[in-house]
Amino acid sequence: METVVWSKPEHERAGTPLLVMLHGYGRDESRMAKLFGSLPSAFTCSALRGPKEIGDGYGWFLLDYFLTHDFADVISSTNAVFGWIESVKAQHSSISLFGYSQGMAMATTLLRLRPAQFRAVVGLSGFVLENELLAMSESFEARPPFFWGRDRDDVVINDAATEHTEAWLHEHTQLTARTYPAMGHSISAAELVDVSAFLRHYVLRPGGVAQGAA
């Protein structure tokens, strides 16, 4: 990835759990970087910039209102993120994902293709891609911990996408689902409190893959 913002300087990252953060459609890495201070400080957070220019911002693949996608775009961006993770993962005790909006679609696609690679996943105000090729490639030996946060009245994610997302998450993950009334298509302070508790429990607690103080 060409542009990455880190929560810690390089000399403080070794041995820490890594949280890879993926922004939404038409946004950029700065949206995720603003959240660093609201997440457990034991993590090294990395906010990645999507490779496609979308208006004044960036994205991971082109979308329309119905969330129709070009699978070649999806795989291109997915491979770019996998390549970047490969370049840094040896420095870290575990890898987890955090995706907002389209970033949640990216995070779940990464999870579907390499489920054993990720300790936990957070998906906020987003969706899971409905794609036969991805469905055929899935191979989950265990249910990974997944936090799904949203507003039931979010008008950006259509009902069909939400229904598919809910069904997929219940089938394939160890799901923690929370809703936040009046939040809209955004991220709330209360939601970040719950996300932090989830990450502490599934990644930082004693006996987990990674340990540390929040």
Regions found by a protein language model. Name each.
Residues 1-94:
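Serine-hydrolase catalytic machinery in alpha/beta-hydrolase-like enzymes
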Residues 34, 109-113:
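Active-site signature of alpha/beta-hydrolase-fold catalytic machinery across serine-
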Residues 98-103, 107:
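Gly/Ala-rich beta-loop-alpha elbow adjacent to hydrolase catalytic centers
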Residues 116-128:
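A conserved short beta-strand
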Residues 128-145:
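Conserved serine/cysteine hydrolase catalytic core
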Residues 130, 152-157, 185-186:
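Acidic catalytic loop of the alpha/beta-hydrolase fold
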Residues 147-150:
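Short beta-strand/loop motif that positions the catalytic acidic residue
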Residues 160-214:
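C-terminal catalytic histidine-bearing segment of alpha/beta-hydrolase fold enzymes
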